């Protein structure tokens, strides 16, 4: 915000004074928004979850999409230029879902079909374990027909038993969540000390939920079930 205001002031200083800045002229001074909130649109169907990531440009929101495909052979397709660690995270997420299907109201028949996980921005390479909880959420959302709430973002590695493990880049990820309009963020318990590095204005805009198990996210981040329990993303 400070950088945008400074940019506007520099441009105003070049104008004939006195100058009046209103809503319309402010758009011309600072340009089009770099970050457009899209979580509500993207998570409008079951099978899509909003994760938080760190890129070379800082923090970003990473959407994970899950789809159930026709067929009778169980398999997992991964797309989006994912690195080896991220591919392993997807396999772990699916193994957790399979092992705890009954607990989360998922029928065994659904897991007999092929599944596809995709991370958009396919031209951009992606890697790391921190999308594990987001992949788990996308799969459970798809297979239960329950949307992930649009205001929810999350980050964390997931284990086969559902433990949420620590990740890096907490400050950058929460800044990205604030820009994207996400207000409920799930963060690994062991990352709680990292909140000391997050600006106060960011923490004022988001509610950080500290979790140690993926079940804690599943209990509160999903909306009501749709009439169809398997809706493709």
Could you tell me what each predicted segment is?
Residues 18-24, 32-50, 57-233:
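Peripheral, non-AAA+ core regions of ATP-driven protein-machinery
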Residues 2-14:
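C-terminal helical "lid" of AAA+/P-loop NTPase domains
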